[in-house]
Amino acid sequence: MINFTDINEVRNILNEYDFNFSKSLGQNFLIDSTVCPRMAEICGASDECGVIEIGTGIGTLTSELAKKGGKVVTMEVDKKLYPIIDKTLADFDNIKVLHQDAMKSDLKKIIVEEFESKDVAVCANLPYYITSPILMFLLESGIQWRNITVMIQKEVADRICAEPGKKNTGAITYAIRYYG
């Protein structure tokens, strides 16, 4: 099993598959040894709560979610990552990888097919450029999420937490308050 917090191991696997980061996808991979376990804990991943992860990356967060015991359905749009994911997550039998864009997914169908009647949470490390669209997609889905746990850039967090009517408010400010 890969040590996701060892930069040299991560580099080696990326080099093995001749992977280059895509600026257009806003890719960055978590390697901090404390962030992913904490996110998995906060989102409530467990036998009683399944998780939909948006953006598998190389599987760092995915593996931490899976270690909590429940089913993880993870979606990745970058085809160049598929063989890497197959290798890095091969030891887990509670992960299903969907090769698709989360924004084009039928989340209700995925939940019915994969989680039956369990609670479902969302967990993701979101690129800046797609944070608001993804959050809006999740909020407007009509699904009763157990929770939505995301890592986002400070600028987006500031906009989400802004007081209505202030300079840095945006549609996401009001949407979070409405759906809250």
Spans of features found by a protein language model:
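Catalytic cores of RNA-modifying enzymes
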Residues: 1-180
